[in-house]
């Protein structure tokens, strides 16, 4: 019999919301946390706004040695891991460490630290300084994405399977999906899974400027992210992280754990079509949705809330709307759909995990977060996108989806354990 997998611990760092309470308060208030970039002089760029996080590593309990050793994204992942473990009440010291695994996602990993090291080594780009004295001894840690899950494993006391997932904006959803698959198959009893990204740096901002994917609405940062709105013109870049404790359902029950949700189904597909473009018909995302529902043994009408990718680009939101109609049929018009990127921006590889956190909290509190800044509906996005105001309703089952550059399309079904077939 396939083992059931549940989420028993959550840790979040998101713009405007560090910790599950602050994060959920932000979402349910429909409050935005996007602002002018403060990390560097962004005046030369087309898009000069972001979802930044006020994060003090020392105040978060990191030692000076850890601060030196860990990149900012890694610090986010470890901070969320500590929170998730504390939230779960799981005593990892009492477990066989070889049965504890880690799955971590990130789209750009330590790109910001690599950029900083380049500036040091090149005298801000003027001259290449080959003297190793100019190079940080932490350079290898920044260069190797595998260091991020290694640090999480260290924090969790995990000596089981450790996986790094980097497939763009679906990384955070896929890392949890792969963790669930491994736990079901018996390769681990507990997996700490999630994602972290800190892409607010000149090189990453410039990358998205070059393809005009980010919004130039710099005069109105708080209202710049407008998923599904007819006036949307790109996403707002953000940083963030979310980590979860996943464990086998019966083990969680035996120890009296608080269960946020069961991961009923997960699926991913690739369009194999274009690096940044999307097919208009949404076929591959629709296939992921149907496969995730099939794995969860749930009919499409069981979905109470769809946590959309909703990036705020013209093509994504129309593509996604088509996918929902294709996979959910008439139920697509009845179920509430919203995008939390409207409030905190798009944290690339981390956003899938952050959206899982929002999904399990929606189940926990029976509230659907709104889509902020949705004032002018797009005729091609004609579903119920929960504009402006959160909605109280029974939420037993959530479908959360992700779409990433490269054509990756992923879907996950989360539900109350008692709703399992």
Swiss-Prot record:
<feature type="active site" description="For beta-ketoacyl synthase activity">
    <location>
        <position position="169"/>
    </location>
</feature>
<dbReference type="Pfam" id="PF02801">
    <property type="entry name" value="Ketoacyl-synt_C"/>
</dbReference>
<dbReference type="InterPro" id="IPR000794">
    <property type="entry name" value="Beta-ketoacyl_synthase"/>
</dbReference>
<feature type="domain" description="Ketosynthase family 3 (KS3)">
    <location>
        <begin position="2"/>
        <end position="416"/>
    </location>
</feature>
<dbReference type="GO" id="GO:0006633">
    <property type="term" value="P:fatty acid biosynthetic process"/>
</dbReference>
<keyword id="KW-0012">Acyltransferase</keyword>
<comment type="similarity">
    <text>Belongs to the thiolase-like superfamily. Beta-ketoacyl-ACP synthases family.</text>
</comment>
<dbReference type="GO" id="GO:0004315">
    <property type="term" value="F:3-oxoacyl-[acyl-carrier-protein] synthase activity"/>
</dbReference>
<feature type="active site" description="For beta-ketoacyl synthase activity">
    <location>
        <position position="309"/>
    </location>
</feature>
<dbReference type="InterPro" id="IPR018201">
    <property type="entry name" value="Ketoacyl_synth_AS"/>
</dbReference>
<comment type="pathway">
    <text>Antibiotic biosynthesis; granaticin biosynthesis.</text>
</comment>
<dbReference type="InterPro" id="IPR016039">
    <property type="entry name" value="Thiolase-like"/>
</dbReference>
<protein>
    <recommendedName>
        <fullName>Granaticin polyketide putative beta-ketoacyl synthase 1</fullName>
        <ecNumber>2.3.1.-</ecNumber>
    </recommendedName>
</protein>
<dbReference type="GO" id="GO:0005829">
    <property type="term" value="C:cytosol"/>
</dbReference>
<keyword id="KW-0045">Antibiotic biosynthesis</keyword>
<dbReference type="InterPro" id="IPR014030">
    <property type="entry name" value="Ketoacyl_synth_N"/>
</dbReference>
<dbReference type="Pfam" id="PF00109">
    <property type="entry name" value="ketoacyl-synt"/>
</dbReference>
<dbReference type="InterPro" id="IPR020841">
    <property type="entry name" value="PKS_Beta-ketoAc_synthase_dom"/>
</dbReference>
<dbReference type="InterPro" id="IPR014031">
    <property type="entry name" value="Ketoacyl_synth_C"/>
</dbReference>
<dbReference type="GO" id="GO:0017000">
    <property type="term" value="P:antibiotic biosynthetic process"/>
</dbReference>
<keyword id="KW-0808">Transferase</keyword>
<feature type="active site" description="For beta-ketoacyl synthase activity">
    <location>
        <position position="346"/>
    </location>
</feature>
């Amino acid at each position: 019999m396939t083992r059931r997998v549940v989420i028993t611990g959550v840790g979040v760092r998101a713009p405007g919301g560090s910790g599950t309470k602050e994060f959920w308060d932000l979402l349910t208030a429909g409050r935005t946390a996007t602002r002018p970039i403060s990390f560097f002089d962004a005046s030369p760029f087309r898009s000069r706004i972001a979802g930044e996080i006020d994060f003090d590593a020392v105040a978060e309990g990191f030692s000076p040695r850890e601060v030196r050793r860990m990149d900012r994204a890694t610090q986010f992942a470890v901070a969320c891991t500590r929170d998730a473990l504390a939230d779960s009440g799981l005593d990892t010291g009492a477990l066989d460490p070889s049965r504890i695994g880690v799955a971590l996602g990130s789209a750009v990993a330590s790109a910001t630290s690599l950029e900083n090291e380049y500036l040091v080594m090149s005298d801000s780009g003027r001259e290449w300084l080959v003297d190793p004295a100019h190079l940080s001894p932490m350079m290898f840690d920044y260069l190797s994405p595998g260091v991020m899950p290694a640090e999480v494993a260290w924090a969790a006391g995990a000596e089981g399977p450790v996986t790094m997932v980097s497939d763009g904006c679906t990384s955070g959803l896929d890392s949890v999906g792969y963790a669930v698959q491994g736990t079901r198959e018996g390769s681990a009893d507990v997996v700490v899974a999630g994602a972290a990204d800190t892409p607010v740096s000149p090189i990453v901002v410039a990358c998205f400027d070059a393809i005009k994917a980010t919004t130039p609405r710099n005069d109105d940062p708080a209202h710049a992210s407008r998923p599904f709105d007819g006036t949307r013109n790109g996403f707002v870049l953000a940083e963030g992280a979310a980590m979860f404790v996943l464990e086998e359902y019966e083990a969680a029950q035996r120890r009296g754990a608080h269960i946020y949700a069961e991961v009923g189904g997960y699926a991913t597909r690739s369009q194999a079509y274009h690096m940044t473009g999307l097919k208009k018909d949404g076929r591959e995302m629709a296939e992921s949705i149907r496969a995730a529902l099939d794995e969860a043994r749930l009919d499409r009408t069981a979905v109470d809330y769809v946590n959309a990718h909703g990036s705020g680009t013209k093509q994504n939101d129309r593509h996604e709307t088509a996918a929902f109609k294709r996979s959910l049929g008439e139920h697509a018009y009845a179920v509430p759909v919203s995008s939390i990127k409207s409030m905190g921006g798009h944290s690339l590889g981390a956003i899938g995990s952050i959206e899982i956190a929002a999904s399990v909290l929606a189940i926990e509190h029976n509230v659907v977060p709104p889509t902020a800044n949705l004032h002018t509906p797009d005729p091609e996005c004609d579903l119920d996108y929960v504009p402006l105001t959160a909605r109280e309703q029974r939420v037993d089952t959530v479908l959360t989806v992700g779409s990433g550059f490269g054509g990756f399309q992923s879907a996950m079904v989360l539900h109350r354990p008692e709703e399992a077939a």
